[in-house]
From Swiss-Prot:
The keyword Cell division does not apply. The active site is at D28, D30. It holds the Pfam family NT5C. This is Putative 5'(3')-deoxyribonucleotidase. The keyword Cell wall biogenesis/degradation does not apply. It comes from Vibrio phage KVP40 (isolate Vibrio parahaemolyticus/Japan/Matsuzaki/1991).
Amino acid sequence: MKLMNVVKLMIRAIARAKKTDKPIVYIDMDNVLVDFQSGIDSLSIWEKNQYEGRYDECPGIFAHMKPMKGAIAAFEVLNKHFDCYILSTAPWDNPGSWQDKRLWVERYLGKGAYKRLILSHHKQLNFGHYLIDDRTKNGAGEFMGEHIHFGTDEFPDWFSVVTYLTSENK
């Protein structure tokens, strides 16, 4: 039996155990749901100089980030068709970012969504049908379902992702 068939069987078993027939979708935060640049833009000149090249380590940066264009509406649409989780990585050297990410999810995606937040540096350990991520780092490139590479020519924005995932021809 091919590895992909085994993975699909495992995913179905997990879905049955959870009593859902909806496909599982994981959605990254930074530069997918969250506009990371908006956080950088909110920093003081001192903070920009102090944390240049490692802005994710700046305390409080995640609390100031805005949603990516179309991200909130896309999440709402996908949530109707899929079993959605937020799968993100938080920097080890900025423990406050873990809390800020949780608060961001609650603020923009609703009170119940924070219970669907998973913070991990090993995204490949999560079983699901799709991972929407802008990078291949932290296990995204080894994800056993389909990696929807956000921000690429094929999936440049949320409209293209939602269109692809909700198409009848899938």
